[in-house]
Amino acid sequence: MKFALTGGGTGGHLSIAKALAIELEKQGVEAIYLGSTYGQDKEWFENSPLFSERYFFNTQGVVNKSFFKKINSLFLQVKAAFKAKEILKKHQITHTISVGGFSAGPASFASLLNHIPLYIHEQNAIKGSLNRYLSPKAKAVFSSYAFKDKGNHVLTSYPVQNAFFDYARTRAEIKHILFLGGSQGAKAINEFALLNAPKLTKQGIKITHICGSDAHEKMRFFYQELGLLDKIELFAFHNNIIEVMRRADLCVSRAGASSVWELCANGLPTIFIPYPFASNNHQYYNVLEFEKENLCYVVPQNELLPKKLFEVIRKLNQKDDQGNKNLTIISAKLQQKIAKDGAKTIIETILSA
Protein backbone atom coordinates (compact mmCIF):
# COMPACT_ATOMS: atom_id res chain seq x y z
CA MET A 1 0.00 0.00 0.00
CA LYS A 2 1.41 3.38 -1.05
CA PHE A 3 -0.26 6.79 -1.22
CA ALA A 4 0.21 9.83 -3.43
CA LEU A 5 -0.75 13.22 -2.00
CA THR A 6 -1.29 16.01 -4.48
CA GLY A 7 -2.46 19.63 -4.56
CA GLY A 8 -1.57 22.91 -2.97
CA GLY A 9 -0.59 26.28 -4.37
CA THR A 10 -1.57 28.11 -1.18
CA GLY A 11 -1.02 27.52 2.51
CA GLY A 12 -4.65 26.48 3.04
CA HIS A 13 -4.43 23.50 0.69
CA LEU A 14 -0.90 22.64 1.82
CA SER A 15 -1.75 22.61 5.53
CA ILE A 16 -4.31 19.88 4.79
CA ALA A 17 -1.75 17.90 2.80
CA LYS A 18 0.65 18.18 5.73
CA ALA A 19 -1.95 17.05 8.29
CA LEU A 20 -2.84 14.03 6.13
CA ALA A 21 0.83 13.19 5.52
CA ILE A 22 1.53 13.28 9.26
CA GLU A 23 -1.34 10.86 9.83
CA LEU A 24 -0.14 8.52 7.07
CA GLU A 25 3.29 8.48 8.70
CA LYS A 26 1.69 7.60 12.06
CA GLN A 27 -0.14 4.74 10.37
CA GLY A 28 3.13 3.49 8.84
CA VAL A 29 1.99 4.18 5.27
CA GLU A 30 4.53 5.45 2.72
CA ALA A 31 3.55 8.50 0.66
CA ILE A 32 4.91 10.55 -2.22
CA TYR A 33 3.94 14.14 -3.08
CA LEU A 34 3.16 15.67 -6.48
CA GLY A 35 2.77 19.43 -6.77
CA SER A 36 3.81 22.46 -8.80
CA THR A 37 6.87 24.67 -9.13
CA TYR A 38 4.45 27.60 -9.07
CA GLY A 39 2.98 28.66 -5.72
CA GLN A 40 4.12 27.51 -2.29
CA ASP A 41 4.38 23.74 -2.87
CA LYS A 42 8.20 23.55 -3.03
CA GLU A 43 8.55 25.90 -0.07
CA TRP A 44 6.47 23.52 2.06
CA PHE A 45 7.54 20.10 0.85
CA GLU A 46 10.75 20.15 -1.22
CA ASN A 47 12.76 18.81 1.73
CA SER A 48 9.94 17.34 3.79
CA PRO A 49 10.73 14.00 5.47
CA LEU A 50 7.00 13.18 5.38
CA PHE A 51 7.37 11.95 1.79
CA SER A 52 9.68 9.32 0.30
CA GLU A 53 9.73 11.24 -3.00
CA ARG A 54 8.58 14.70 -4.08
CA TYR A 55 7.80 15.85 -7.63
CA PHE A 56 7.06 19.39 -8.81
CA PHE A 57 5.66 20.08 -12.28
CA ASN A 58 5.73 23.28 -14.31
CA THR A 59 2.00 23.99 -14.02
CA GLN A 60 -0.21 26.99 -13.35
CA GLY A 61 -3.88 27.67 -12.73
CA VAL A 62 -6.38 27.94 -15.56
CA VAL A 63 -9.17 30.13 -14.12
CA ASN A 64 -9.19 33.94 -14.28
CA LYS A 65 -6.82 34.03 -17.26
CA SER A 66 -7.03 35.34 -20.81
CA PHE A 67 -7.89 32.87 -23.58
CA PHE A 68 -4.31 32.34 -24.76
CA LYS A 69 -2.95 32.00 -21.22
CA LYS A 70 -5.67 29.45 -20.47
CA ILE A 71 -4.60 27.41 -23.52
CA ASN A 72 -0.98 27.50 -22.36
CA SER A 73 -1.94 26.51 -18.79
CA LEU A 74 -4.06 23.62 -20.08
CA PHE A 75 -1.17 22.42 -22.25
CA LEU A 76 1.14 22.42 -19.21
CA GLN A 77 -1.47 20.53 -17.17
CA VAL A 78 -1.86 17.83 -19.84
CA LYS A 79 1.90 17.50 -20.30
CA ALA A 80 2.37 17.13 -16.52
CA ALA A 81 -0.50 14.61 -16.29
CA PHE A 82 1.35 12.18 -18.57
CA LYS A 83 4.51 12.59 -16.49
CA ALA A 84 2.47 11.99 -13.33
CA LYS A 85 0.95 8.87 -14.91
CA GLU A 86 4.42 7.33 -15.25
CA ILE A 87 5.45 8.40 -11.73
CA LEU A 88 2.36 6.81 -10.15
CA LYS A 89 3.00 3.62 -12.11
CA LYS A 90 6.70 3.58 -11.14
CA HIS A 91 5.88 3.90 -7.41
CA GLN A 92 2.98 1.44 -7.61
CA ILE A 93 0.62 3.92 -5.98
CA THR A 94 -2.56 2.34 -4.60
CA HIS A 95 -4.43 5.47 -3.43
CA THR A 96 -4.31 9.15 -4.40
CA ILE A 97 -5.56 11.98 -2.19
CA SER A 98 -6.09 15.41 -3.74
CA VAL A 99 -6.34 18.44 -1.47
CA GLY A 100 -7.37 20.69 -4.36
CA GLY A 101 -5.78 23.69 -6.00
CA PHE A 102 -4.44 23.85 -9.55
CA SER A 103 -1.36 21.77 -8.70
CA ALA A 104 -3.63 18.78 -7.99
CA GLY A 105 -4.66 18.52 -11.64
CA PRO A 106 -1.91 16.35 -13.18
CA ALA A 107 -1.77 13.63 -10.50
CA SER A 108 -5.57 13.54 -10.13
CA PHE A 109 -6.14 12.96 -13.85
CA ALA A 110 -3.20 10.54 -13.95
CA SER A 111 -4.81 8.52 -11.16
CA LEU A 112 -8.03 8.22 -13.14
CA LEU A 113 -6.06 7.15 -16.23
CA ASN A 114 -4.22 4.53 -14.14
CA HIS A 115 -7.45 3.37 -12.46
CA ILE A 116 -6.09 4.34 -9.03
CA PRO A 117 -8.82 5.23 -6.47
CA LEU A 118 -8.95 9.03 -6.15
CA TYR A 119 -10.02 10.67 -2.89
CA ILE A 120 -10.62 14.41 -2.63
CA HIS A 121 -10.63 16.83 0.26
CA GLU A 122 -12.67 19.96 -0.48
CA GLN A 123 -11.65 22.60 2.03
CA ASN A 124 -14.10 25.34 1.06
CA ALA A 125 -17.87 25.70 1.38
CA ILE A 126 -17.99 26.29 -2.41
CA LYS A 127 -16.09 23.81 -4.57
CA GLY A 128 -13.24 24.92 -6.78
CA SER A 129 -13.50 24.28 -10.53
CA LEU A 130 -11.13 21.28 -10.49
CA ASN A 131 -12.97 19.57 -7.64
CA ARG A 132 -16.35 20.25 -9.26
CA TYR A 133 -15.17 18.34 -12.32
CA LEU A 134 -13.39 15.53 -10.46
CA SER A 135 -15.89 14.92 -7.64
CA PRO A 136 -18.23 12.57 -9.58
CA LYS A 137 -15.21 10.48 -10.60
CA ALA A 138 -13.72 10.26 -7.10
CA LYS A 139 -14.12 7.37 -4.68
CA ALA A 140 -15.07 9.85 -1.93
CA VAL A 141 -15.07 13.60 -1.32
CA PHE A 142 -14.32 14.68 2.25
CA SER A 143 -15.43 18.07 3.53
CA SER A 144 -16.40 19.90 6.71
CA TYR A 145 -19.21 21.63 4.83
CA ALA A 146 -22.47 19.94 3.82
CA PHE A 147 -23.07 20.01 0.06
CA LYS A 148 -26.48 19.69 -1.59
CA ASP A 149 -25.23 17.03 -4.04
CA LYS A 150 -24.43 14.51 -1.31
CA GLY A 151 -23.54 11.55 -3.56
CA ASN A 152 -20.06 10.35 -2.57
CA HIS A 153 -19.52 13.16 -0.04
CA VAL A 154 -18.32 12.32 3.46
CA LEU A 155 -18.81 14.95 6.18
CA THR A 156 -15.77 14.98 8.48
CA SER A 157 -14.09 17.26 10.94
CA TYR A 158 -11.56 19.58 9.30
CA PRO A 159 -8.01 18.12 9.35
CA VAL A 160 -6.49 20.63 11.74
CA GLN A 161 -3.19 19.79 13.44
CA ASN A 162 -3.78 18.59 17.00
CA ALA A 163 -1.57 21.34 18.42
CA PHE A 164 -4.32 23.91 17.69
CA PHE A 165 -6.57 21.95 20.06
CA ASP A 166 -3.80 21.32 22.58
CA TYR A 167 -3.13 25.05 22.97
CA ALA A 168 -6.78 26.12 22.93
CA ARG A 169 -8.16 28.18 25.81
CA THR A 170 -11.41 29.93 26.67
CA ARG A 171 -10.98 33.70 26.47
CA ALA A 172 -12.16 35.90 29.33
CA GLU A 173 -10.85 39.37 28.48
CA ILE A 174 -9.52 41.17 25.39
CA LYS A 175 -5.93 42.01 26.26
CA HIS A 176 -4.26 40.98 23.00
CA ILE A 177 -5.42 41.26 19.36
CA LEU A 178 -3.95 39.34 16.43
CA PHE A 179 -4.16 40.86 12.94
CA LEU A 180 -3.62 37.94 10.59
CA GLY A 181 -2.71 39.25 7.15
CA GLY A 182 -1.42 35.85 6.03
CA SER A 183 1.83 34.90 4.32
CA GLN A 184 0.78 36.79 1.17
CA GLY A 185 -0.35 39.84 3.12
CA ALA A 186 -3.81 41.41 3.02
CA LYS A 187 -3.72 45.13 2.32
CA ALA A 188 -7.15 45.81 3.83
CA ILE A 189 -6.28 44.06 7.12
CA ASN A 190 -2.86 45.72 7.26
CA GLU A 191 -4.43 49.17 6.90
CA PHE A 192 -7.16 48.27 9.42
CA ALA A 193 -4.49 47.28 11.96
CA LEU A 194 -2.50 50.44 11.37
CA LEU A 195 -5.52 52.73 11.76
CA ASN A 196 -6.57 51.07 15.02
CA ALA A 197 -3.11 50.68 16.56
CA PRO A 198 -2.88 54.12 18.26
CA LYS A 199 -6.18 53.74 20.14
CA LEU A 200 -5.55 50.07 21.01
CA THR A 201 -2.11 50.70 22.46
CA LYS A 202 -3.44 53.70 24.39
CA GLN A 203 -6.00 51.35 25.97
CA GLY A 204 -3.24 48.91 26.91
CA ILE A 205 -4.25 46.25 24.39
CA LYS A 206 -1.32 44.32 22.92
CA ILE A 207 -1.04 43.90 19.16
CA THR A 208 0.52 41.14 17.09
CA HIS A 209 0.43 41.90 13.38
CA ILE A 210 1.46 39.38 10.71
CA CYS A 211 1.49 41.54 7.60
CA GLY A 212 3.04 39.39 4.84
CA SER A 213 6.56 39.68 3.44
CA ASP A 214 5.68 42.14 0.65
CA ALA A 215 4.24 44.68 3.09
CA HIS A 216 6.68 44.20 5.95
CA GLU A 217 9.07 47.09 5.27
CA LYS A 218 6.20 49.47 4.54
CA MET A 219 4.42 48.48 7.78
CA ARG A 220 7.64 48.91 9.77
CA PHE A 221 7.95 52.43 8.38
CA PHE A 222 4.34 53.39 9.19
CA TYR A 223 4.49 52.00 12.75
CA GLN A 224 7.80 53.82 13.23
CA GLU A 225 6.19 57.07 12.07
CA LEU A 226 3.39 56.54 14.59
CA GLY A 227 5.96 55.90 17.33
CA LEU A 228 4.50 52.43 17.89
CA LEU A 229 7.08 50.05 16.42
CA ASP A 230 8.51 49.17 19.82
CA LYS A 231 5.02 48.79 21.32
CA ILE A 232 3.65 46.14 18.95
CA GLU A 233 4.80 42.79 17.52
CA LEU A 234 5.20 42.99 13.75
CA PHE A 235 6.10 39.96 11.60
CA ALA A 236 6.27 39.31 7.87
CA PHE A 237 5.25 35.76 8.73
CA HIS A 238 5.51 33.54 11.80
CA ASN A 239 6.74 29.96 11.96
CA ASN A 240 4.72 29.19 15.09
CA ILE A 241 1.21 30.40 14.32
CA ILE A 242 -0.19 28.13 17.04
CA GLU A 243 1.69 30.02 19.74
CA VAL A 244 0.64 33.36 18.23
CA MET A 245 -3.03 32.32 18.30
CA ARG A 246 -2.71 30.96 21.83
CA ARG A 247 -1.65 34.35 23.19
CA ALA A 248 -4.39 36.32 21.40
CA ASP A 249 -7.89 37.04 22.71
CA LEU A 250 -9.37 38.34 19.45
CA CYS A 251 -8.30 37.91 15.83
CA VAL A 252 -8.88 39.80 12.57
CA SER A 253 -8.42 37.50 9.58
CA ARG A 254 -9.33 36.58 6.03
CA ALA A 255 -11.70 33.62 5.76
CA GLY A 256 -9.66 30.94 4.05
CA ALA A 257 -10.98 27.57 5.24
CA SER A 258 -7.83 26.41 7.03
CA SER A 259 -7.57 29.67 8.97
CA VAL A 260 -11.27 29.51 9.87
CA TRP A 261 -11.05 26.00 11.33
CA GLU A 262 -7.67 26.51 13.01
CA LEU A 263 -9.04 29.57 14.80
CA CYS A 264 -12.13 27.54 15.69
CA ALA A 265 -10.04 24.70 17.16
CA ASN A 266 -8.08 27.23 19.20
CA GLY A 267 -11.27 28.86 20.54
CA LEU A 268 -10.18 32.28 19.28
CA PRO A 269 -13.09 34.68 18.53
CA THR A 270 -12.53 36.32 15.16
CA ILE A 271 -13.62 39.17 12.93
CA PHE A 272 -13.51 37.75 9.40
CA ILE A 273 -12.89 39.96 6.37
CA PRO A 274 -13.64 37.65 3.41
CA TYR A 275 -11.45 38.29 0.38
CA PRO A 276 -13.96 39.87 -2.03
CA PHE A 277 -12.31 38.51 -5.18
CA ALA A 278 -12.11 34.86 -4.09
CA SER A 279 -13.63 32.53 -6.70
CA ASN A 280 -17.40 32.18 -6.23
CA ASN A 281 -17.06 34.35 -3.10
CA HIS A 282 -16.12 31.13 -1.25
CA GLN A 283 -14.49 32.92 1.70
CA TYR A 284 -17.82 34.46 2.65
CA TYR A 285 -19.54 31.06 2.48
CA ASN A 286 -16.73 29.51 4.55
CA VAL A 287 -17.90 31.56 7.54
CA LEU A 288 -21.61 31.91 6.79
CA GLU A 289 -22.58 29.03 9.09
CA PHE A 290 -20.39 30.46 11.87
CA GLU A 291 -22.05 33.86 11.46
CA LYS A 292 -25.55 32.34 11.59
CA GLU A 293 -24.62 30.60 14.84
CA ASN A 294 -23.24 33.88 16.30
CA LEU A 295 -19.75 32.37 16.53
CA CYS A 296 -17.93 35.12 14.64
CA TYR A 297 -18.28 38.59 13.15
CA VAL A 298 -18.15 39.07 9.39
CA VAL A 299 -17.34 42.49 7.93
CA PRO A 300 -17.29 42.99 4.14
CA GLN A 301 -14.06 44.63 3.01
CA ASN A 302 -15.87 47.71 1.68
CA GLU A 303 -17.34 48.29 5.17
CA LEU A 304 -14.05 47.92 7.03
CA LEU A 305 -13.94 51.19 8.96
CA PRO A 306 -11.75 51.54 12.09
CA LYS A 307 -14.82 51.96 14.32
CA LYS A 308 -15.96 48.42 13.40
CA LEU A 309 -13.27 46.92 15.62
CA PHE A 310 -14.43 48.80 18.70
CA GLU A 311 -18.08 48.01 17.93
CA VAL A 312 -17.18 44.30 18.00
CA ILE A 313 -15.12 44.70 21.18
CA ARG A 314 -18.12 46.34 22.88
CA LYS A 315 -20.38 43.47 21.79
CA LEU A 316 -17.89 40.86 23.00
CA ASN A 317 -17.69 42.55 26.40
CA GLN A 318 -21.47 42.51 26.86
CA LYS A 319 -22.83 39.91 29.30
CA ASP A 320 -25.80 37.56 29.21
CA ASP A 321 -28.34 37.14 32.03
CA GLN A 322 -25.97 34.79 33.88
CA GLY A 323 -23.15 37.33 33.77
CA ASN A 324 -21.10 35.54 31.09
CA LYS A 325 -19.31 37.69 28.53
CA ASN A 326 -20.09 37.09 24.86
CA LEU A 327 -16.34 36.71 24.37
CA THR A 328 -16.24 33.73 26.74
CA ILE A 329 -19.43 32.17 25.37
CA ILE A 330 -18.19 32.32 21.76
CA SER A 331 -14.73 31.05 22.69
CA ALA A 332 -16.18 28.01 24.48
CA LYS A 333 -18.68 27.22 21.70
CA LEU A 334 -15.99 27.40 19.01
CA GLN A 335 -14.06 24.63 20.74
CA GLN A 336 -17.19 22.46 20.70
CA LYS A 337 -17.82 23.00 16.97
CA ILE A 338 -14.82 21.05 15.70
CA ALA A 339 -13.67 17.58 16.71
CA LYS A 340 -10.06 16.54 17.06
CA ASP A 341 -8.41 13.98 14.73
CA GLY A 342 -10.03 15.07 11.45
CA ALA A 343 -7.02 13.81 9.48
CA LYS A 344 -7.08 10.49 11.33
CA THR A 345 -10.77 9.99 10.48
CA ILE A 346 -10.12 10.67 6.78
CA ILE A 347 -7.15 8.29 6.54
CA GLU A 348 -8.88 5.52 8.50
CA THR A 349 -11.98 5.86 6.30
CA ILE A 350 -9.83 5.41 3.19
CA LEU A 351 -7.85 2.50 4.65
CA SER A 352 -11.02 0.66 5.64
CA ALA A 353 -12.73 1.12 2.25
From Swiss-Prot:
Signal peptide: none annotated. It is an enzyme of class 2 (transferase). GO terms for biological process: carbohydrate metabolic process; cell division; cell wall organization; lipid glycosylation; peptidoglycan biosynthetic process; regulation of cell shape. It is a peripheral membrane protein. GO terms for molecular function: UDP-N-acetyl-D-glucosamine:N-acetylmuramoyl-L-alanyl-D-glutamyl-meso-2,6-diaminopimelyl-D-alanyl-D-alanine-diphosphoundecaprenol 4-beta-N-acetylglucosaminlytransferase activity; undecaprenyldiphospho-muramoylpentapeptide beta-N-acetylglucosaminyltransferase activity. Pathway: Cell wall biogenesis; peptidoglycan biosynthesis. GO terms for cellular component: plasma membrane. The keyword Ribosomal protein does not apply. UDP-N-acetyl-alpha-D-glucosamine binds at T10, G11, G12, N124, S183, Q283. It catalyses: di-trans,octa-cis-undecaprenyl diphospho-N-acetyl-alpha-D-muramoyl-L-alanyl-D-glutamyl-meso-2,6-diaminopimeloyl-D-alanyl-D-alanine + UDP-N-acetyl-alpha-D-glucosamine = di-trans,octa-cis-undecaprenyl diphospho-[N-acetyl-alpha-D-glucosaminyl-(1->4)]-N-acetyl-alpha-D-muramoyl-L-alanyl-D-glutamyl-meso-2,6-diaminopimeloyl-D-alanyl-D-alanine + UDP + H(+). Its EC number is 2.4.1.227. Keywords: Cell cycle, Cell division, Cell inner membrane, Cell membrane, Cell shape, Cell wall biogenesis/degradation, Glycosyltransferase, Membrane, Peptidoglycan synthesis, Transferase. Its main location: membrane. The keyword Glycosyltransferase applies. It is found in: Cell inner membrane. Disulfide bonds: none annotated. HAMAP family: MurG. Belongs to the glycosyltransferase 28 family. MurG subfamily. Cell wall formation. Catalyzes the transfer of a GlcNAc subunit on undecaprenyl-pyrophosphoryl-MurNAc-pentapeptide (lipid intermediate I) to form undecaprenyl-pyrophosphoryl-MurNAc-(pentapeptide)GlcNAc (lipid intermediate II). This is UDP-N-acetylglucosamine--N-acetylmuramyl-(pentapeptide) pyrophosphoryl-undecaprenol N-acetylglucosamine transferase. It comes from Helicobacter pylori (strain P12). The gene is murG.
